Amino acid sequence: MRDYDEVTAFLGEWGPFQRLIFFLLSASIIPNGFTGLSSVFLIATPEHRCRVPDAANLSSAWRNHTVPLRLRDGREVPHSCRRYRLATIANFSALGLEPGRDVDLGQLEQESCLDGWEFSQDVYLSTIVTEWNLVCEDDWKAPLTISLFFVGVLLGSFISGQLSDRFGRKNVLFVTMGMQTGFSFLQIFSKNFEMFVVLFVLVGMGQISNYVAAFVLGTEILGKSVRIIFSTLGVCIFYAFGYMVLPLFAYFIRDWRMLLVALTMPGVLCVALWWFIPESPRWLISQGRFEEAEVIIRKAAKANGIVVPSTIFDPSELQDLSSKKQQSHNILDLLRTWNIRMVTIMSIMLWMTISVGYFGLSLDTPNLHGDIFVNCFLSAMVEVPAYVLAWLLLQYLPRRYSMATALFLGGSVLLFMQLVPPDLYYLATVLVMVGKFGVTAAFSMVYVYTAELYPTVVRNMGVGVSSTASRLGSILSPYFVYLGAYDRFLPYILMGSLTILTAILTLFLPESFGTPLPDTIDQMLRVKGMKHRKTPSHTRMLKDGQERPTILKSTAF
């Protein structure tokens, strides 16, 4: 019996057909790059202060002293959420009293912004924060909006695999791409905050679903060697390119509704890819649709200038993997023995911390000194060398030390942030970018490392649980950024400390580099410093299928 790769080996690895599929599927990821982090600009909070009605009878001196001062980052700035009691200062103005000279401003009664806010338009013409006044008592709604987007990502990650298994990779790719683009466009017509948030959740569901569908479609169509490059560099770098495009759009378009219009246009253009991207022949074969799969392979051979055998797929010859009797496993197997339990707990902590660091630093770019658009672009650009470095480390160096080094680098520079003098704000920006570099490299490597730790019988389940933990981390990340409103360095201290602790934790995980993939739970590598403990479940676990000893060198997002 021959498997799919052997049957289609005559196509070659890197012909015109494979190159087309590689670049088109990678290009379909570009909208995901700017959709996922568009909240950096859509939900930005400009400088603001309490509005004073034009009808208020105040002298020019009192109009310049309606807002009290407060300390922020060691300097006095106008308060964003309080003003002096308007009726009181109107009386002082009518009496001809001068602020500071005749009236002690420190003794004046204050009130909230009863007449709304005035928002600076130096950077943004409008955001959803200025649209619906998401400041002061309602400032918690801004991070909630971002968290709910990631809730949509979490929900989408649950259903995307099942949908593509049931309806096909190509169908799910384009339907969810349309879902992401369509609901993003509908956000333009949001009448209130609640409508915007509900649509944002649906955008998040579509965003992760088409990402997963494109990833699976590419890994199933492309050959073994190209598959590695596609999964480690192709989708990641094109995602980063989409992220880099985001600040470019936002620089020229300062209104949030018009920015959304611009961000949905590339998604509309992706519709044309329908006529160039085929369905996965592997999936068609799994559905018994051999003739359709053969048509696709013949077109691929024609594009590559290769003579096609008279018969490509012989149903009796292909391995029917689904016919193999398999022992069922459930999520409790990830906790069955002491060793796999420790690997699972440590993997969950690792993934969650890395996700908090990656998205926390990405969302924090508006709070850095300097130009927000340049900072966002740098945050995106630094991901490209991080992905390349991660790929090289996966090829040649041990996993544990590579992961720990990347995390130590990312965490330590974040802790140094509080030591940077205020006048060296460019150094602070450099440190944040170095931290983002380290965390991004670790994020890219953790997929491979986790997959290598778990045995074949529960590998998919183990990576799935870990990936879910990363989604939970992304949901929490906006609130780490939110803490910066109370202490500028608190987010960096928390993220840096967690990242360093996770780096230390990584050193206790087994080293999988250069070792065959385990097939059964008994074959798993042992957690460092832990003695082997026999449990009754060892005898219950039976070997469940064979997998050729190999080393994983690709990520599976």
Curated annotation (Swiss-Prot):
Effect of Y211C: In CDSP; loss of carnitine transport
Keywords: ATP-binding, Cell membrane, Disease variant, Endoplasmic reticulum, Glycoprotein, Ion transport, Membrane, Nucleotide-binding, Phosphoprotein, Sodium, Sodium transport, Symport, Transmembrane, Transmembrane helix, Transport
Residues given in the record as ATP binding sites: G218, T219, E220, I221, L222, G223, K224, S225
Variant or mutagenesis effect after changing A44V: In CDSP; carnitine transport reduced to less than 10% of wild-type
Outcome, altering R169Q: In CDSP; loss of carnitine transport
Subcellular localization: Cell membrane; Apical cell membrane; Basal cell membrane
Induction cue: Intestinal expression is induced by IFNG.
Effect annotated for changing N32S: In CDSP; carnitine transport reduced to less than 1% of wild-type
Reported pH dependence: Optimum pH is from 7 to 8.5.
Residues in compartment: Cytoplasmic: 1-20, 164-172, 219-232, 279-341, 395-406, 452-462
Name of the protein: Organic cation/carnitine transporter 2
